[in-house]
């Protein structure tokens, strides 16, 4: 049995919201890119919507992360070394929080540019222009942005694992869990936000995607609990109210998994989207809070 | 360059007087927390932003008849930052606020730390705490300011039993070896040095003589003395695999077909 004596860092609501927003922002950007590259011509509208929503979520990420700091005005110390006589940039590849800071900055740039262009095209669409297809370089740009988005969605889990805190450091599956759940919540959010833009075919495809993501999340969840059990740390996450949260998390996977099994479109789109998104938030709450007591 | 310095804390002569706690707070102007009174003499409970020295009382001696030769005693140990050679806190700190000083000690620069608290979850000893007053992570500095004035740390200066000894590491190692040999000669077979060699985080500048296993004192043993970076590769790999599967699944599910209402945008 692994023994830990680390103290709790006091990462609570701001960090939880940051991790949640990061999953949504990264996930929306990735789904928008897939729609742009592989979707139908009509899906381009949904792709633009994804890019338009990803950027405000990234802005929220920055706000949540900064507010959580003990000295928010010194947030830039993450990037610039202010040690007297040292100077230069802070770059520690072995520290996920250090890489993540840069990834967040870069993804912010990519999502901002995508946001601006998507907004411009959106205006043209409203004006009735016919040719709204993005130029080739936009697709390359979006692929790079998607890689950063996936990193943003997943590194938050790696930050937790790369520690000596019980639960977090006892499992290597948290990053996988966060990226899978981020994609799942994003698909649910996109289906809900884009219900006026999507036709029946697009809705069905989004639900199928969410089903795949939920399946991936379920596998990651099983790995998470298996790794904790192997480390003898299950009790540190299944105590108090948290076992109830974990049950709710598992239950929240049912709507997308059912949609995966059924050929017909699942009913209650808005409600099931809400259940999926709430489940993803609850999962982050359970992971973050249960380990700190 | 000054010689590496540190603490040798000999728990066999600690009497639990807490003079070290008081001296540390006085010198470093730490207000301390509200005392926590429970079933024991330990009212500080832990190391944190306000407690840079903490006298642990391992007082769970079972009730029973004590005869000559089978007695049991409380264990006491003045705990402190270990100033590890391979420091987990320093490894993860994204701002480089945690540095190794010219005395080979580990120091958090208050003006550089922005209070992200990653070091707290990394420190395997639960040493570092977050101060809401300063907005930064705080821990023992090994009295960095006193060292610069050729003074010994406050805790070592006041310790009435010399349980806490300060000095150059080479001198402290020699003293610790001699003390351990004396205890073993007296039949204290459980006595052991913790952090004297490089098996715990490459060696600790603040090392201990313990009268029982490290776990009894709430210290990780050799198997559990691991750095956060051990999880980097596995965690990134799992995340990468999940992301790759997610993208593949997304492409498979979201790709447009003629049946789904039009040709793919990429080929439009």
Predicted regions and their residues:
Chain A
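N-terminal signal-anchor module of multipass membrane proteins
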Residues: 1-41, 277, 285, 289-293
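C-terminal TM-helix exit segments that contain a strictly Trp-centered aromatic cap at the helix terminus
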Residues: 60-72, 152-159, 219-228, 280-290
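Membrane helical hairpin/interfacial module
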Residues: 24-80, 86-103
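Long, contiguous internal "core" modules enriched in hydrophobic/ aromatic residues
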Residues: 12, 19-21, 38-41, 47, ...
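Extramembrane terminal tails and long inter-domain/linker segments of multi-pass membrane proteins
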Residues: 1-9, 76-93, 125-132, 277-293
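Active-site acidic/histidine clusters and adjacent loop/turn architecture
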Residues: 106
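Short hydrophobic alpha-helical membrane-anchoring segments
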Residues: 32, 36, 62-65, 114, ...
